[in-house]
Amino acid sequence: MNTQDVIDIFKQADAILEGHFILTSGRHSATYMQKAKVFMHAHLTEKLCRGLAEKIKKSVEEKIDYVVGPAIGGLIPSYETSRHLGIPSLWVERVNGRFELRRFEIKKGARVVIVEDIVTTGLSIRETVEALVTAGANVLASACILDRSGGKVDVGVPLISLAEYEIASYASDAVPAELAELPAIKPGSRNI
């Protein structure tokens, strides 16, 4: 599966939105990849996560004990990717604003791969790495369906992307005038 295949799946689900969006990262963009519209279709989600699992198998040489997803956005892709890898799926969730592995215990040194939906700044993955290291895990890599940075983001561990698709985004004090004229919509899941 290549980048165009991923974009075609998003198009098939009418999941590429145009307008003025405030992303989960806080950055502004004229394009929003509404993965919820993809994830509501099991057959499309299965295709993406099978492709991601295949890339993980090719990229990670060590045995993986768990796939871990950051709630909320990483829950569905981490679960479906773990199904294709044949290993358990866990998740971290926010407690007082910080990710914690609160519903599970893992053995010290457990080898994990983080799976996220879409990466823009990489903050959720970096926070997930921190939570997992605190819990005693060995984070081998992270993976995402779509890297909006076009491969430029640093998440602190190797990042395996099913697709790299650079989409312009702007700090709140650098939004172009034509974008600022449109009403901003915040469809993301941070602070839910």
Swiss-Prot record:
CDD domains, A to Z: PRTases_typeI
Catalytic reaction annotation: orotidine 5'-phosphate + diphosphate = orotate + 5-phospho-alpha-D-ribose 1-diphosphate
Alphabetized GO MF terms: magnesium ion binding; orotate phosphoribosyltransferase activity
Pathway(s) it belongs to: Pyrimidine metabolism; UMP biosynthesis via de novo pathway; UMP from orotate: step 1/2
Keyword Magnesium: yes
Residues that coordinate or bind 5-phospho-alpha-D-ribose 1-diphosphate: 116-124
Keywords: Glycosyltransferase, Magnesium, Pyrimidine biosynthesis, Transferase
Annotated positions binding orotate: 120, 148
Co-factor requirement: Mg(2+)
Record-linked InterPro entries: OPRT (IPR023031), Orotate_PRibTrfase_bac (IPR006273), PRibTrfase_dom (IPR000836), PRTase-like (IPR029057)
Any Pfam family hit: Pribosyltran
EC number: 2.4.2.10
Disulfide bonds: none
SUPFAM superfamilies in UniProt: PRTase-like
GO biological process: 'de novo' UMP biosynthetic process; pyrimidine nucleobase biosynthetic process
Entry superkingdom: Bacteria
UniProt subunit comment: Homodimer.
Role description: Catalyzes the transfer of a ribosyl phosphate group from 5-phosphoribose 1-diphosphate to orotate, leading to the formation of orotidine monophosphate (OMP).
Family affiliation: Belongs to the purine/pyrimidine phosphoribosyltransferase family. PyrE subfamily.
Protein name as catalogued: Orotate phosphoribosyltransferase
Gene name linked to the record: pyrE
